[in-house]
Amino acid sequence: SGLTSLTLPSSVTSIGWATFSGCSGLTSLTLPSSVTSIDGRAFYGCSSLFGLTLPSSVTSIGSSAFEGCRSLFSLTLPSSVTEIGESAFRGCHSLASLTLPSSVTEIGESAFRGCSGLTSLTLPSSVTSIGKSAFEGCSGLTSIYVSWESPLSIDASTFKDANTGKCILYVPKGTYDDYWLSNWGIFENIVEYDATGIDHITTSGEAKEISRYAADGQRLEVPAKGLNIVKYSDGSVKKVVVQ
Protein backbone atom coordinates (compact mmCIF):
# COMPACT_ATOMS: atom_id res chain seq x y z
CA SER A 1 0.00 0.00 0.00
CA GLY A 2 3.06 2.30 0.21
CA LEU A 3 3.61 2.36 -3.56
CA THR A 4 2.23 5.65 -4.96
CA SER A 5 3.53 5.87 -8.53
CA LEU A 6 4.76 3.35 -11.02
CA THR A 7 6.80 3.55 -14.24
CA LEU A 8 7.77 0.24 -15.81
CA PRO A 9 10.79 -0.35 -18.11
CA SER A 10 10.41 -1.04 -21.83
CA SER A 11 11.48 -4.66 -21.35
CA VAL A 12 8.08 -5.49 -19.83
CA THR A 13 5.63 -7.07 -22.30
CA SER A 14 2.80 -8.15 -19.99
CA ILE A 15 1.50 -7.37 -16.53
CA GLY A 16 1.00 -10.75 -14.86
CA TRP A 17 -1.81 -12.11 -12.74
CA ALA A 18 -2.42 -10.01 -9.58
CA THR A 19 1.00 -8.33 -9.93
CA PHE A 20 -0.04 -5.07 -8.26
CA SER A 21 -3.25 -6.28 -6.63
CA GLY A 22 -4.07 -4.39 -3.45
CA CYS A 23 -1.62 -1.51 -4.00
CA SER A 24 -4.16 0.87 -2.49
CA GLY A 25 -1.76 3.84 -2.41
CA LEU A 26 -0.97 3.75 -6.14
CA THR A 27 -2.23 6.99 -7.73
CA SER A 28 -0.43 7.12 -11.09
CA LEU A 29 0.65 4.52 -13.58
CA THR A 30 2.86 4.71 -16.69
CA LEU A 31 3.10 1.63 -18.86
CA PRO A 32 5.70 1.30 -21.66
CA SER A 33 4.69 0.75 -25.29
CA SER A 34 6.10 -2.77 -25.07
CA VAL A 35 3.15 -3.99 -22.96
CA THR A 36 0.63 -6.01 -24.99
CA SER A 37 -1.52 -7.60 -22.29
CA ILE A 38 -2.76 -6.85 -18.81
CA ASP A 39 -3.65 -10.09 -17.08
CA GLY A 40 -6.37 -10.88 -14.58
CA ARG A 41 -6.46 -8.95 -11.29
CA ALA A 42 -3.27 -7.12 -12.29
CA PHE A 43 -4.36 -3.89 -10.56
CA TYR A 44 -7.28 -5.27 -8.54
CA GLY A 45 -8.18 -3.03 -5.61
CA CYS A 46 -5.81 -0.18 -6.50
CA SER A 47 -8.37 2.11 -4.93
CA SER A 48 -6.37 5.37 -5.27
CA LEU A 49 -5.54 5.04 -8.98
CA PHE A 50 -7.00 8.17 -10.58
CA GLY A 51 -6.20 8.32 -14.30
CA LEU A 52 -5.28 5.60 -16.73
CA THR A 53 -3.95 5.84 -20.28
CA LEU A 54 -2.95 2.54 -21.80
CA PRO A 55 -0.25 2.41 -24.52
CA SER A 56 -1.28 1.62 -28.10
CA SER A 57 0.38 -1.79 -27.85
CA VAL A 58 -2.18 -3.24 -25.40
CA THR A 59 -4.62 -5.67 -27.04
CA SER A 60 -6.33 -7.36 -24.11
CA ILE A 61 -7.43 -6.46 -20.59
CA GLY A 62 -7.88 -9.50 -18.36
CA SER A 63 -10.65 -10.42 -15.95
CA SER A 64 -10.92 -8.13 -12.90
CA ALA A 65 -7.75 -6.34 -14.07
CA PHE A 66 -8.90 -3.00 -12.62
CA GLU A 67 -11.81 -4.18 -10.49
CA GLY A 68 -12.30 -2.05 -7.39
CA CYS A 69 -10.26 0.91 -8.66
CA ARG A 70 -12.91 3.15 -7.16
CA SER A 71 -11.01 6.44 -7.72
CA LEU A 72 -10.50 5.83 -11.45
CA PHE A 73 -12.04 8.88 -13.12
CA SER A 74 -10.29 9.04 -16.48
CA LEU A 75 -9.86 6.05 -18.77
CA THR A 76 -8.32 6.15 -22.25
CA LEU A 77 -8.33 2.89 -24.18
CA PRO A 78 -6.13 2.71 -27.31
CA SER A 79 -7.36 1.52 -30.71
CA SER A 80 -5.33 -1.67 -30.26
CA VAL A 81 -7.61 -3.11 -27.56
CA THR A 82 -9.86 -5.89 -28.86
CA GLU A 83 -11.03 -7.59 -25.68
CA ILE A 84 -12.21 -6.31 -22.30
CA GLY A 85 -12.34 -9.19 -19.85
CA GLU A 86 -14.93 -10.25 -17.32
CA SER A 87 -15.30 -7.74 -14.45
CA ALA A 88 -12.32 -5.80 -15.87
CA PHE A 89 -13.52 -2.43 -14.53
CA ARG A 90 -16.18 -3.64 -12.11
CA GLY A 91 -16.84 -1.25 -9.25
CA CYS A 92 -14.97 1.69 -10.79
CA HIS A 93 -17.76 3.99 -9.66
CA SER A 94 -15.84 7.25 -10.24
CA LEU A 95 -15.55 6.61 -13.99
CA ALA A 96 -17.61 9.35 -15.67
CA SER A 97 -17.53 8.71 -19.42
CA LEU A 98 -16.47 5.88 -21.66
CA THR A 99 -15.83 5.77 -25.40
CA LEU A 100 -14.66 2.40 -26.60
CA PRO A 101 -12.33 2.36 -29.63
CA SER A 102 -13.55 0.77 -32.86
CA SER A 103 -11.11 -2.10 -32.36
CA VAL A 104 -13.04 -3.61 -29.44
CA THR A 105 -14.96 -6.76 -30.36
CA GLU A 106 -15.76 -8.32 -27.00
CA ILE A 107 -16.95 -6.92 -23.67
CA GLY A 108 -16.95 -9.57 -20.95
CA GLU A 109 -19.56 -10.34 -18.31
CA SER A 110 -19.84 -7.65 -15.61
CA ALA A 111 -17.01 -5.72 -17.31
CA PHE A 112 -18.31 -2.33 -16.11
CA ARG A 113 -20.76 -3.55 -13.49
CA GLY A 114 -21.34 -1.09 -10.69
CA CYS A 115 -19.78 1.88 -12.51
CA SER A 116 -22.49 4.10 -11.06
CA GLY A 117 -20.70 7.35 -11.94
CA LEU A 118 -20.74 6.57 -15.66
CA THR A 119 -23.00 9.08 -17.44
CA SER A 120 -22.11 8.61 -21.11
CA LEU A 121 -21.34 5.45 -23.05
CA THR A 122 -20.35 5.04 -26.71
CA LEU A 123 -20.35 1.53 -28.17
CA PRO A 124 -18.72 1.09 -31.61
CA SER A 125 -20.15 -1.22 -34.28
CA SER A 126 -17.03 -3.40 -34.02
CA VAL A 127 -18.41 -4.93 -30.81
CA THR A 128 -19.87 -8.37 -31.55
CA SER A 129 -20.39 -9.63 -28.01
CA ILE A 130 -21.51 -8.01 -24.75
CA GLY A 131 -21.58 -10.31 -21.73
CA LYS A 132 -24.29 -10.64 -19.11
CA SER A 133 -24.47 -7.80 -16.57
CA ALA A 134 -21.74 -5.91 -18.46
CA PHE A 135 -23.26 -2.55 -17.47
CA GLU A 136 -25.45 -3.68 -14.58
CA GLY A 137 -25.72 -1.07 -11.85
CA CYS A 138 -24.59 1.79 -14.11
CA SER A 139 -27.36 3.87 -12.56
CA GLY A 140 -25.91 7.24 -13.60
CA LEU A 141 -26.13 6.66 -17.36
CA THR A 142 -27.94 9.46 -19.20
CA SER A 143 -26.85 8.69 -22.78
CA ILE A 144 -25.80 5.63 -24.77
CA TYR A 145 -24.68 5.84 -28.41
CA VAL A 146 -24.76 2.72 -30.59
CA SER A 147 -24.14 2.36 -34.32
CA TRP A 148 -25.25 -1.18 -35.21
CA GLU A 149 -27.69 -1.11 -38.13
CA SER A 150 -29.14 -4.31 -36.67
CA PRO A 151 -29.37 -4.39 -32.84
CA LEU A 152 -26.68 -6.48 -31.18
CA SER A 153 -28.19 -9.29 -29.13
CA ILE A 154 -27.85 -8.59 -25.41
CA ASP A 155 -29.01 -10.36 -22.27
CA ALA A 156 -31.80 -8.86 -20.17
CA SER A 157 -29.24 -8.34 -17.38
CA THR A 158 -26.82 -6.26 -19.48
CA PHE A 159 -28.23 -2.92 -18.28
CA LYS A 160 -29.98 -4.16 -15.14
CA ASP A 161 -30.55 -1.38 -12.58
CA ALA A 162 -29.67 1.34 -15.09
CA ASN A 163 -32.11 4.25 -15.13
CA THR A 164 -33.84 3.13 -18.33
CA GLY A 165 -36.53 5.77 -17.89
CA LYS A 166 -34.04 8.65 -17.90
CA CYS A 167 -31.19 7.36 -20.08
CA ILE A 168 -31.49 8.19 -23.80
CA LEU A 169 -30.49 5.47 -26.25
CA TYR A 170 -29.23 6.97 -29.52
CA VAL A 171 -29.59 4.58 -32.48
CA PRO A 172 -28.86 4.90 -36.24
CA LYS A 173 -31.52 6.50 -38.43
CA GLY A 174 -34.21 4.08 -39.55
CA THR A 175 -33.59 1.52 -36.78
CA TYR A 176 -35.96 2.74 -34.04
CA ASP A 177 -38.46 -0.12 -34.44
CA ASP A 178 -35.77 -2.80 -34.48
CA TYR A 179 -34.26 -1.55 -31.22
CA TRP A 180 -37.64 -1.00 -29.57
CA LEU A 181 -38.63 -4.61 -30.32
CA SER A 182 -35.32 -6.06 -29.03
CA ASN A 183 -33.89 -6.24 -25.50
CA TRP A 184 -32.74 -2.65 -26.07
CA GLY A 185 -36.42 -1.74 -25.81
CA ILE A 186 -36.07 -1.49 -22.02
CA PHE A 187 -34.94 2.09 -22.68
CA GLU A 188 -38.02 4.32 -22.72
CA ASN A 189 -36.28 7.05 -24.72
CA ILE A 190 -34.87 5.86 -28.03
CA VAL A 191 -33.72 8.60 -30.41
CA GLU A 192 -32.50 8.17 -33.99
CA TYR A 193 -29.37 10.07 -35.08
CA ASP A 194 -26.77 10.13 -37.84
CA ALA A 195 -24.33 7.45 -36.68
CA THR A 196 -21.85 7.83 -39.53
CA GLY A 197 -19.34 9.63 -37.33
CA ILE A 198 -19.49 7.33 -34.33
CA ASP A 199 -16.55 5.12 -35.34
CA HIS A 200 -14.53 7.55 -37.42
CA ILE A 201 -14.99 11.24 -36.69
CA THR A 202 -14.72 13.39 -39.81
CA THR A 203 -15.18 17.07 -40.48
CA SER A 204 -18.51 18.06 -41.92
CA GLY A 205 -17.32 19.70 -45.17
CA GLU A 206 -19.11 22.97 -45.90
CA ALA A 207 -21.68 22.44 -43.15
CA LYS A 208 -21.57 24.86 -40.24
CA GLU A 209 -22.07 24.12 -36.59
CA ILE A 210 -25.48 25.31 -35.42
CA SER A 211 -25.64 23.89 -31.89
CA ARG A 212 -23.62 21.91 -29.36
CA TYR A 213 -24.68 19.77 -26.42
CA ALA A 214 -23.06 17.96 -23.52
CA ALA A 215 -23.52 14.19 -23.18
CA ASP A 216 -26.41 14.78 -20.75
CA GLY A 217 -28.27 16.89 -23.32
CA GLN A 218 -27.45 20.30 -21.82
CA ARG A 219 -26.91 23.06 -24.41
CA LEU A 220 -23.32 24.33 -24.57
CA GLU A 221 -22.34 27.85 -25.61
CA VAL A 222 -18.68 26.88 -26.07
CA PRO A 223 -16.89 23.52 -26.39
CA ALA A 224 -16.58 21.74 -23.05
CA LYS A 225 -14.10 19.07 -22.03
CA GLY A 226 -15.37 15.57 -22.67
CA LEU A 227 -17.99 14.27 -25.07
CA ASN A 228 -19.77 16.99 -27.11
CA ILE A 229 -22.67 16.37 -29.50
CA VAL A 230 -22.55 18.82 -32.42
CA LYS A 231 -25.41 19.53 -34.83
CA TYR A 232 -24.55 20.92 -38.29
CA SER A 233 -26.49 22.96 -40.83
CA ASP A 234 -26.80 19.97 -43.18
CA GLY A 235 -28.77 18.08 -40.53
CA SER A 236 -25.92 15.81 -39.48
CA VAL A 237 -25.01 15.14 -35.86
CA LYS A 238 -21.45 14.32 -34.87
CA LYS A 239 -19.82 13.10 -31.69
CA VAL A 240 -16.71 15.13 -30.80
CA VAL A 241 -14.37 14.45 -27.89
CA VAL A 242 -12.82 17.65 -26.52
CA GLN A 243 -9.56 17.06 -24.67
Predicted regions and their residues:
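Structural signature of tandem-repeat unit edges
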Residues: S1-S14, S24-S37, S47-S60, R70-E83, ...
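A recurrent domain-boundary module in secreted/ectodomain proteins
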Residues: W180-G197
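Residue-level detector of functionally pivotal "anchor" positions at catalytic/ligand-binding pockets or at interdomain
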Residues: Y193-R212, D216
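Acidic surface patches and DE-rich sequence motifs
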Residues: T202, A214, P223, Y232-D234
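C-terminal tail/sorting-segment detector
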Residues: L227-Q243
